[in-house]
Amino acid sequence: MHKILLVDDDRELTSLLKELLEMEGFSVIIAYDGEQALTLLDSTIDLLLLDIMMPKKNGIDTLKEIRRQYQIPVIMLTARGSDLDRVLGLELGADDYLPKQFNDRELVARI
């Protein structure tokens, strides 16, 4: 079973995504900010779903730290969907970038 670390401060969204992804056969661990994500991240995680705007440590800073130690696939899930935000996320090492208000099937297909 593939393990996903879902990092987002929106508790309602994380609950819904956890349910969706578990129905698709994934194991899901939730972190509500970047600091918590960094403490939970280890070599058993297969994919990271990462929000940008979070308290304590935002997604951009979290992604920078992750890339120093891990080559884990990262999909940015964020309300910031401008072209500039997408390019910045990809340049910093995200493997994919999906603006919120996404279709569940699209998310699962990208995973």
Residue ranges of each PLM-predicted region?
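C-terminal output helix
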Residues: 82, 101-111
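Acidic, metal-coordinating helix/loop segments flanking the phosphotransfer/catalytic sites
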Residues: 30-47
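Acidic catalytic/metal-coordinating carboxylates
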Residues: 32-33, 58-61, 85
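Active-site residues of response regulator receiver
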Residues: 51, 78
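Short amphipathic alpha-helix used as the core "switch/output" element in two-component signaling
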Residues: 39, 58-71
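Receiver (REC) domain active-site loop signature in two-component systems and cognate sites
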Residues: 54
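Charged docking surfaces used in two-component/phosphorelay signaling
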Residues: 15-23
